[in-house]
Every structure is written in C-alpha cells, then in structure tokens.
C-alpha cells in the first residue's frame, strides 16, 4: 500500500507540473492507459492472496479516481490559460478607426449614358433598342452607304459572314424604328458599337447614342436648338458656345460636325483642345431622302434630323479623363473616384 501511495504522490506531482495539454495527455496514458501503471496494478491483483484482493482493488480504484480528478482539474486550468493567451493575441483595439462599408457605384460610362438619356428624355425623346449583331442592309444599305464605301472595308468592320456583322453604329436602330411605325418619331438609341480601331482615343468596342426626330416642317434650326439645349445642360454651362461645321455623312444631307467651346480653358486654348479653343463632340444633319425612301416615308411631306455622339468621348470631357482605355481596364482605383 505504501508503494501505491508513493505512486499517487508522484502522479499528482507530475500532473501539477504539466505545462500544456499534450504533456497532460501523456501522463494520462502513462498512469491510466491500457498499459498504464495503475492499470497494471489492477492486473496484478490475481497474484495476491484471496483475502487481500478486495481491499487492494478498492485502493487501486480510489487511486485511479484521484489521478483522473487531478488530470481533469489540470486540463481545465491549462485550457483556460491557453484560451486567455489566445484572446490576448486576438484582442481588438477599440480605439482604432473602423473599417468603412465598401460602397459600389455606377461605371462612369453608365453614368454618362443615364445622364444623356435623362436630358434628352426631358426634350421628349424616347429610348429605342436594336440588335448588336446586324445585317448588311440595316447597318449600311438602308443608311445610304453604298457597297464601295470605305466603312464597309474588312479593316473597319467586324464581319461574321458576308451578310452578318457587329454593328458599327446605332443608326440601324433608327431604320428599324421607322420601318415599324409612322411619323412623327422622336427617339434616341444608346448602345454598344464595334469597329476595328484601338488607341488612346479609340476602342474596338465603345458606346454611342444616336438621335432621330422626324415630323412635318422640321428644319436645321430645330436641330441646332435641340443640340444647343442638350449640350448646355450636359456640361452645366448655360452660356456654352457651339459651332456647326459642314461635314459629310452618307445618311444625312446637309451634314455637320458640332464643336463646343473648350470646357477646360473657356476657349483660351489648352492641351485638351489642342490650343484651338474648340472641342468636337458629335456629328449631325438632316435625314437623307434616300434613307426615307428605304423605309417608305414620303420625304416631300416629312423631314427630320439625326445626330450621333460617342459616350466615352462625352465622359472624357465631363470627367477630365485623357485616356479612353481607362474606362475598360477595370482599375478599381480609377473607378472608385466615381462611386
């Protein structure tokens, strides 16, 4: 029995000196495992005289309970200490500034399209849409663009086959609108267009907004009035000066390029306007009689005007962006400025 007491004393001392749960588990195996010291003591009971076995068995079982209770108590203490140490390492400094909730925002191109459609909507224009994969007739022929026109060249247009292509402008939407209805028309067609071009100011895919107004008695003066009102509202300059330069487009006659006084230097001349004081923003003109003929509208009774502008170009001018490619590179540092 004295040997058993010494065994218990040594076990309790070892348990009390265990510094982590792994060492404690090793002690459990050493004393209470299948081949543990106390387990072997129980197995040796058969060697004792019969009259000594009950008392010895009870003493060994009490020893096992004592060791087991000591193991449980020490395990609880070590677990609490480990948790406290872990919490100390993971503590939160409540004096640090909090992390703001990330807030998204519309892409600058989307914002610009919405601004354009909203302003032209206030002038009575309704949004119309059409397919991005177009046929040759609606993209070219119906718009008075003959087969020999440079715009039909492979290096300017993405073709699927001889008759199918990615639309090079949103003007085909105007043709489809006029095919499906009767005047008067007052529509705008925002959307993606595609051309074989890529540099600082051009992209293979970009966005356009085309406008069309057809009615009786429509003149170039109406066109100028609409565009002046729109541009002044878009750039938020009530005294914004515009000029219309003669130009050529197959689907309008007469045609013009629209310039605005540079919104960056006020017309004094700067790097943005190449020191001319003017910025080109869109093309326009009166709808060509041949276009009316393709859609069955009497050009003797009805007249109309059309205009088209590049959304990215307008966004660059409005937000002071000097590289078109920034709109498509998905750089969060750039896009976050518009959130």
Curated annotation (Swiss-Prot):
Cofactors required: Mg(2+)
Segments passing through the bilayer: none
Taxonomic superkingdom: Bacteria
Gene Ontology cellular-component annotations: cytoplasm
GO biological process annotation, one example: phenylalanyl-tRNA aminoacylation
Compartments where located: Cytoplasm
Catalytic activity of the protein: tRNA(Phe) + L-phenylalanine + ATP = L-phenylalanyl-tRNA(Phe) + AMP + diphosphate + H(+)
Listed GO MF terms: ATP binding; magnesium ion binding; phenylalanine-tRNA ligase activity; tRNA binding
EC number(s) reported in the record: 6.1.1.20
Binding positions for Mg(2+) per the UniProt entry: 253
Co-factor remark: Binds 2 magnesium ions per tetramer.
InterPro entries per UniProt: aa-tRNA-synth_II, aa-tRNA-synth_II/BPL/LPL, Phe-tRNA-synth_IIc_asu, Phe-tRNA_ligase_II_N, Phe_tRNA_ligase_alpha1_bac, Phenylalanyl-tRNA_Synthase, tRNA-bd_arm
Primary localisation category: cytoplasm
Keywords in alphabetical order: Aminoacyl-tRNA synthetase, ATP-binding, Cytoplasm, Ligase, Magnesium, Metal-binding, Nucleotide-binding, Protein biosynthesis
Statement: the UniProt record of this protein carries the keyword rRNA-binding: no
Coiled coil: none
NCBIfam families named in the record: pheS
UniProt family annotation: Belongs to the class-II aminoacyl-tRNA synthetase family. Phe-tRNA synthetase alpha subunit type 1 subfamily.
Quaternary state and interactors: Tetramer of two alpha and two beta subunits.
Annotated protein name in UniProt: Phenylalanine--tRNA ligase alpha subunit
Species annotation: Thioalkalivibrio sulfidiphilus (strain HL-EbGR7)
């Amino acid at each position: 029995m004295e040997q058993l007491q010494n065994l218990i004393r040594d076990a309790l001392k070892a348990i009390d000196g265990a510094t982590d749960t792994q060492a404690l588990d090793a002690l459990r195996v050493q004393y209470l495992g299948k081949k543990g010291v106390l387990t072997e003591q129980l197995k040796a009971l058969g060697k004792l005289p019969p009259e000594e076995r009950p008392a010895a068995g009870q003493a060994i079982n009490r020893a096992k309970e004592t060791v087991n209770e000591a193991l449980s108590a020490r395990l609880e203490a070590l677990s609490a200490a480990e948790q406290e140490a872990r919490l100390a390492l993971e503590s939160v400094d409540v004096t640090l500034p909090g992390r703001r909730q990330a807030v998204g925002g519309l892409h600058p191109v989307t914002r610009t399209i919405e601004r354009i459609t909203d302003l032209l909507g206030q002038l009575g224009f309704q949004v119309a849409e059409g397919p991005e994969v177009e046929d040759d007739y609606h993209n070219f022929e119906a718009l008075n663009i003959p087969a020999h026109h440079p715009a039909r060249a492979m290096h300017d247009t993405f073709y699927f086959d001889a008759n199918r292509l990615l639309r090079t402008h949103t003007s085909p939407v105007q043709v489809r609108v006029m095919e499906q209805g009767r005047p008067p028309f007052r529509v705008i067609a925002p959307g993606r267009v595609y051309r074989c071009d890529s540099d600082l100011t051009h992209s293979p895919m970009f966005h356009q907004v085309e406008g069309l107004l057809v009615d009786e008695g429509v003149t170039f003066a109406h066109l100028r009035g609409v565009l002046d009102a729109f541009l002044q509202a878009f750039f938020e300059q009530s005294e914004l000066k515009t000029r219309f330069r003669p130009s050529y487009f197959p689907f309008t006659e007469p045609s013009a390029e629209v310039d605005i006084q540079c919104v960056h230097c006020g017309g004094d001349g700067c790097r943005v306007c190449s020191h001319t004081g003017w910025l080109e923003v869109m093309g326009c003109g009166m709808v060509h009689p041949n276009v009316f003929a393709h859609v069955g509208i009497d050009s003797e009774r009805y007249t109309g005007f059309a205009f088209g502008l590049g959304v990215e170009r307008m966004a660059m001018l409005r937000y002071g962006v000097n590289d078109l490619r920034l709109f498509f590179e998905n750089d969060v540092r750039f896009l976050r400025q518009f959130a």
